[in-house]
């Protein structure tokens, strides 16, 4: 029975890159905001530089704007980390003949996203590899009605050999063919 159900855990927004950018934007945003406030009140709020000599309009005002924008993006990123947006699992159940895709969303009516598909509606397992400026390497659940449901999380592109191996294992487990999208 254990080999009839497969569950793949999906890491959501709790990745190192999100922690790094949240911290970087928080520190940078605070620095810019304090520099702008220092130029307005002519009081040095930053110990490592003298920002009282900045002219408030336009330098101080622009620094305050960029600082506030950076803090806003940092807070948003921290909230996605705290709420673990995008995490969940993919469950492939050969006993019940179902595929379940479960993800966490933002608070509200759709906090937990549950997509359920019958294995009889699944045509194949697809792999999509795009190179270039924004490379993507993803595994898809290809349905008979021509919809493609992404199964891999948004992350740094994995090695093509690992992606192919993972897709091949899944296709063998579900007894489906593998296709290139």
Curated annotation (Swiss-Prot):
A single Gene Ontology CC annotation of this entry is: chloroplast thylakoid membrane
Q: Which GO terms describe its biological process?
A: photosynthesis
Q: Where in the cell is it found?
A: Plastid, Chloroplast thylakoid membrane
Question: The organism sits in which domain of life?
Answer: Eukaryota
| Membrane protein topology class | Multi-pass membrane protein
Segments spanning the bilayer are 19-39, 62-82
Q: Which HAMAP family match?
A: Ycf4
State what this protein does.
Answer: Seems to be required for the assembly of the photosystem I complex.
Q: What family is this?
A: Belongs to the Ycf4 family.
Q: What is this protein called?
A: Photosystem I assembly protein Ycf4
Q: What species is given as this protein's source?
A: Phaeodactylum tricornutum (strain CCAP 1055/1)
The UniProt gene name for this protein comes to: ycf4
């Amino acid at each position: 029975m254990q080999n009839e159900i497969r569950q793949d855990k999906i890491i959501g927004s709790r990745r190192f890159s999100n922690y790094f950018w949240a911290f970087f934007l928080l520190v940078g945003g605070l620095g810019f905001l304090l520099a702008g406030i220092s130029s307005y009140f002519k009081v040095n709020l930053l110990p490592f530089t003298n920002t009282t000599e900045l002219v408030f309009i336009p330098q101080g005002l622009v620094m305050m704007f960029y600082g506030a924008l950076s803090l806003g993006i940092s807070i948003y990123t921290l909230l996605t980390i705290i709420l673990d947006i995008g995490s969940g699992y993919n469950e492939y159940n050969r006993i019940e003949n179902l595929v379940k895709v479960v993800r966490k969303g933002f608070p509200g009516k759709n906090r937990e996203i549950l997509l359920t598909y019958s294995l009889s509606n699944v045509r194949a397992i697809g792999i999509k590899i795009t190179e270039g400026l924004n490379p993507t390497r993803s595994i898809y659940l290809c349905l008979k009605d021509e919809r493609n449901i992404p199964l891999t999380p948004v992350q740094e592109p994995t090695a093509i050999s690992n992606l192919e191996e993972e897709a091949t294992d899944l296709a063998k487990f579900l007894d489906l063919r593998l296709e290139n999208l």
